[in-house]
Structure formats: C-alpha cells, structure tokens
Amino acid sequence: MKNDDEQSSLMVAVIGIIPVIWFALLVAPYLSSGLMGILDGVPEAMNHPFSIRLCGDSVKTVLIFLLSYGMGIGIYISTKKHYRRGEEHGSAKWGNVKKINRRYREKRFTKNKLLTMHVRISYNMRKHLRNVLTVVIGGSGSGKTRFFAKPNLMQANTSFVVLDPKGENLRDTGYLLEEKGYEVRVLDLINMEKSHCYNPFVYLKDDNDVQRLVTNLFKATTPKGSQSNDPFWDTAASMLLLALIFYLRYEAPEEEQNFPMVMEMLRAGEVREDDDQYQSPLDELFERLEMKNPEHIAVKYYKDYHSGSAKTLKSIQITLATRLEKFNLSSLAALTATDDLDLPSLGERKVALFALIPDNDTSYNFLVSILYTQLFQQLFYLADHKYGGRLPVHVHFLMDEFANVSLPDDFDKILSVMRSREVSVSIILQNLAQLKALFEKQWESIMGNCDEFLYLGGNEQGTHKYVSELLGKATIDTNTYGKSTGHSGNYSTNYQNTGRELMTPDEVRMLDNRYAIFFIRGERPILDEKFDILKHPNVGLTTDGNGKPYLHGAVDRAVASISLGDSLEGELTDDSLESEDYELLSDEDLEEIIQKYV
C-alpha cells in the first residue's frame, strides 16, 4: 500500500509540470517590467489563457518556475508526515465474533470444529485457507475436557484418536459415537485385560520402519531430564534389539512377530562372563542364519553387537532388558501379542480410537508414544499411496495430557505436512511451560504451525505474559491534570494518547472462568464464552445429558465370545453334582467340547 501511494504522488508531481510551464509562458512577457509589471500583467494574461506569446525571457522564466516547483516538491517530501490517527502506539482491538464466525464456519453445525460458544471453524481448509491445528492451554479446572474435547467428540464428524486420562471421554461419549456409526477401539493401559490388542510389528512395512520403532522406543523409555554420559550402552542395546526384530520380521511366522517373542529371544541369549567361548541358544540361532544368508540384515546387527567381551555383552543385555522390562508382565505381553486396532482404517471410515492412560502413572506411556508415531506413518502412507494425497475421512488427534507422552523430535515438521493429508491435531496443555520443557528449541515452531490458539485460563506467569504480548497494544486517550495554589493559582488539563496492552498479564490471570481468549491467524483476537456442552444437540446421548455410559471390555462387547447354547440346559443341577461326578478336563478335551457346540 505504501508503494502504491508513492507511485500516485510521483504521477501527480509529473503531471503538475504541465501547468507550471503554461503559467511560466504567460508570465514571461512581463518579466522585464519587474514585480509590479508582473502583478499588473498576470490578471490580463489570465483573461486570455491560450494567448501565449514567446519572447526572449520565455526560456528563463520556464526554468525559474520549474526550479521553484522542484524545490517546493522537495520541501513537501522532506517534511511529509505519516499519521495513523488513533493508532500511534498500537492498533490492537477485539475481533467481531459474529463476523469472524461467519467467515470460517460451515452452515451445517456438525461440520465444524467447536472452539468457543459462538466461534467454530470448518474442516474444509480450502474454504478459509487456514489449517485446523489447535493449541489449547488451560490450567486444572479450566475445562479443557468439558469445554473443548467433549464438544468436539460430540460433533462426530471425523475419525478420532483420543488420549484419554482416566477414560472419562470414552465413558461419557462412547455410546454416542457408536450410535453415530463409529467403530470404537480402546487401548486401555489402566485395565489391560479389557483392552484391544496393539502389536507394533504389524505396521512395519520396511527396514526404515524397524529403525524408527527402535529409536522411538528408546526415546520413549528414557526418563525426562536424564542424560547419559556414555551413549555406548544404549547404542549397543539398540543394535541387539534391531537384530532380534529383523530376525522375527524375516524368519519367524507372523504369530511370533511381537515383543513377547523378543523377550523370549533375549532370555535365550545367556552370556557366561567366565566363558567367552560359550554359545547360547540365541548365538546358535544366528549362526545358522549366517550359514544360510551371510548378508542377512539381522546377522549384520547381531555381529556388531556380539563383537565385545562376555562381560560387555552381559551389560548390553541388561541395558536392553531394562528398556523392555514392562513386556515381562503377562498383561502387557498379552496386549501386544496380536493386533486389533487396524490403524490405517481410521483414514477410510469413522473410527474412534481411545488410548486410556493412568493420570498418576506414566509407566506405560511409551506404548502410546509408539502408537502416535506409527499412526502418523500409516495415515501419511495411506494418503500418499492410495488416495492421491488426501484421506477420504479426516482424522483428528485430541492430544489431552500432551506433555505426558514422548513424541518424535521432528514433531514440528510432522505438523507442517499433515494438513494436506486431512490429518489434524489439538494439542492440549496446562501451560506454555510444558511445551517449552518438551521442545526447548522447537516450541515456537509448533505454536507457529498451529493456526488456532485457545486460552481457557490458568495460573502460570509465562503463559500470562505470552497471551498478553500476543494480544498486542492499543492506543488510548489519557488526561493529565495540573493545579497550582497561591496568589495566582491555576488549573490545567492536558490531553494526550499513549499505548496500553489490550490485556496486561495481570488481567489475563484474572480472566473470568466463563470466558476464553481465542486467536486465529490473520484475525483480531476474540473474547467469547466457553462452549456450553449442555446446549449441544447430541448431549442427550452422553452422560452429561443423562445418556448411557460406555462400558468397554464387557461380555457383550467382546471381540469373540463362546456360547454353549441350550443343549446343556437342565442337564446339570446343584443336586446332581457330587465330588465323584466330575473330573478336570485337559486342554485337548476342553477344545473338543467347545468345537462340538460352536
């Protein structure tokens, strides 16, 4: 806009040369008569504006007038001021809720992502040229679940991946989602016997996926803030794990490709510190594989691991066993032995995948970290290789308790490429400090990649300052008063303007719990009420509207169940059973009976 104004001014200045020359030629015949002659002659010349007479002073007069004109233009430019009345110290102000909502929403209510009571945004990113990546920040009790997560689940308009501490979202909205035609799948790390199974090995398409799985596993099982002075042990342990996984991937039957089998192989790799020549069953296994295929990738990694002394090998095994020790638990071993989640299907039909984690124990969160990484890989691959770059069903990650799960170091890059593939995330945090702790160098990039930022309130000073600076400064009018006393006292009032934050950090801290502050890229900030869940049209199908709670893992929701039917009804009664009337059945006998009635 500034360049356009400069071009317009230049054009006017050039055009102004024409009347200057014309006027100079009118004045030229009177130049020799002095100032009085010019003053007397100009009115007469103006009566006949087109009667121009050339004379000996014409050229000199034109040059004098052009020089004066040029000097005038120069003085004008040098003294020109650029005023923005009322915006001298800043132009920040609150956005118009209705106008902004009208610009970004779909007319059909359930086609939108809900942000505040009166603002929603369409998932059709081509409509408004914004991504639907959202950062939600709110302290405990600010309503991150009630005012944001639940309302968007109740929309039932995308596939969902929900990190659900305590299982509250699943219990309250699972029945609604099933009624809306969703397949509900649950990775339950609280009550694992009720969980669908998840086997990361199923989603390994190539050797790079194996490498990423091992890298992510080691990162996710590293305690926060810990730094190893000697990375040798982790590097060597990762080589051993790569060897075991590659062996299972290429040599074992499909039902043995899982982490429980990795633990079996690790236990078979006995090392005797006093006997470097001892060969364990695991050594013999890889020796046979080397004889069969010396260039096998599993053999290469195993030989790299096995190049040390027996004492070193023992330490490496202990390091790896420490990383994988959770898989010794029968509950986790059973959960990861097979797979029921079918991750790619989330991009093809409406599926709600809930990952339930304890809110007071992070022991098993590493499995959710692996799940996230593989979900991104699977969905991106599906979009690129089957659907021309865009999934047929949008997938929305609701990342509650975002700070409790380890994510890839390049998560900011993942954010930047997911939009085009119909994948979005909502990063839910308690404060900005959590994001800075997770991504010390990339946190600003993550915030910048998200076009929406919703602040629900909190009590962390760094977040207050960040929100205040994001709101910007406004220009306000101020008065100053002066009064002097004495024999000739006087009273004065001065009017001036100054800059002031739209909300100071203290005012951000004091934000009414009914309200939220919402930012969308390229728009004025919005102050609006939080979404009232009881006014959602689908609330009657949730527990908040007295609907049925969703109970996963019940008999009627089992993946497979066995019924003996009515054939035995009435045959057995308490009176007919004596101690000598029954016997314990072997597994073979039990299987034969089951096959008879199934």
Language-model-detected regions and their locations in the chain:
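Short alpha-helical interface patches
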Residues: V42, H48, V59-N112, D207-L217, ...
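Short secondary-structure boundary/capping segments
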Residues: L176-L177, P200-Y203, K441-S445, E469-A474, ...
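Conserved ATP-driven motor cores of ASCE-family P-loop NTPases powering translocation/secretion/packaging/pilus
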Residues: L415-I517
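Short loop or secondary-structure boundary microenvironments that flank
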Residues: I357, D361, E401, L429, ...
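Basic- and hydrophobic-enriched, low-structure N-terminal and domain-boundary segments
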Residues: M1-S142, R146-P151, E193, S484-T485, ...
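A broad, low-specificity signal for short, low-complexity segments enriched in glycine/proline
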Residues: K93-N101, N112, T116-R126, R146-F147, ...
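P-loop NTPase motor domains
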Residues: R130-V423, L438, Q442, T498, ...
